[in-house]
A protein has these predicted regions:
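Short, glycine/charged-enriched secondary-structure capping and boundary segments
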Residues: 53-55, 84, 116-119, 152-155, ...
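Short glycine-/acidic-enriched loop or helix-start segments at secondary-structure transitions
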Residues: 50, 79, 113-114, 148-150, ...
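Cysteine-nucleophile active-site neighborhood
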Residues: 104-173
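N-terminal beta-loop-helix "entrance" segment that forms/cooperates
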Residues: 73-86
């Protein structure tokens, strides 16, 4: 998927070196189709690495995607501050827009109570805004915990030890639109200190668990209309991301275990095997395909379509069914 991102963005040069289409802005303006409009709320301190990983995944289908980069204004960044000023807009700058998609990343704050995070109130306003102005939002890792808690009252619990490694996940419904093409068992990287309350998830009729693992628990969760998608792991991670996290903590003298099912022979000097790449690409391709098939041509109609999908889903759930088109 050709992506339309600002000229000069560091990720653009990296992606072009990988033979991924990143359109020049003047070329994108001349294409006679409406690009999907996606916003990326990047809460990670590693801004450039995270945006590159996500842009790499949303570039894998033949529809142009225009990406706006969003930041919170209630948190003072200590990493890549100049990069944020140059390429990122605040929520207040973007809130008058409608979007086909929104991606909310994780953040290294999962051991804190939600309300203790300094930008929590602003994040809640963004999630509330997205309920009307975004066709589909994908929440990643801590972003998923935040969305499940704020929008569905799903609590998190802290784990006795960090869930760290690559873990097998089993599909709960092989015919689900979002996991179309997935193997019945597939791998997903995880790097987190918390887990969601599974009983609360299973008790919420608006939510469906798409995949889960014996060790990791629920990995992919979505609302019935795919307005919200929650990925508890890190499909966006590159081959070496877990290794980088391991060596970072190791050299800092922090307690850290080897990531499970990752290094060959559990030898951190060996190159990890990239076992989740195809399913990561499938997830984002399926998500963008859903958005493309569902979104109105006129972005001004996004709130109307979101309301129609929600009403349709609620009516079917009240009758004990699920939306047949999904």
């Amino acid at each position: 998927m050709p992506i339309n991102i600002p000229d000069g963005l560091p990720a653009k040069r990296i992606l072009q070196q990988e033979r991924i289409f990143a359109l020049e802005e003047d070329v994108a303006r001349k294409q006679q189709i409406r690009p999907l409009r996606v916003a990326l709320l990047n809460l990670m301190p590693t801004k450039i690495e995270t945006e590159t990983q996500i842009l790499r995944l949303i570039s894998k289908s033949p529809i142009q995607v225009s990406v706006d980069f969003m930041r919170v204004s209630s948190h003072e960044a200590t990493h890549a501050a100049d990069h944020l000023v140059k390429f990122y807009d605040t929520f207040d700058d973007l809130r008058s827009n409608n979007y086909d998609g929104l991606i909310i990343t994780g953040a290294p704050v999962e051991q804190m109570p939600f309300e203790s995070v300094d930008y929590w109130d602003e994040l809640c306003r963004i999630m509330d805004w997205a309920q009307e102005h975004v066709l589909s939002t994908m929440f990643l890792c801590w972003g998923a915990f935040a969305g499940l808690y704020h929008l569905h009252g799903i609590h998190k619990r802290l784990l006795g030890s960090k869930l760290f490694g690559v873990f097998p996940q089993r599909l709960c419904d092989e015919y689900n639109f979002l996991t179309n093409g997935f193997d019945e068992v597939h791998n997903m990287p995880h790097s987190r200190h918390a887990a969601p309350d599974e009983k609360e998830i299973d008790a919420d009729p608006a939510l469906q668990v798409l995949s889960r693992g014996e060790t990791s628990g629920p990995a992919l969760i979505a609302t019935r209309d795919f307005h919200e998608i929650y990925a508890l792991g890190h499909f966006e991670y590159g081959r070496d991301t877990l290794a980088d996290e391991y060596w970072r903590d190791f050299h800092a003298g922090l307690p850290i275990q080897l990531p499970l099912n990752y290094f060959p022979d559990d030898d951190p000097e060996k190159q990890p095997i990239f076992t989740w790449r195809s399913h990561a690409n499938l997830l984002y391709r399926n998500w963008l395909n859903y958005v493309y098939q569902t979104t109105p041509y006129d972005l001004e109609r996004v709130p109307e379509v979101v309301a129609e999908l929600r009403e349709h889903t609620e009516q079917l759930l009240a009758k004990g069914g699920v939306p047949s088109k999904f």
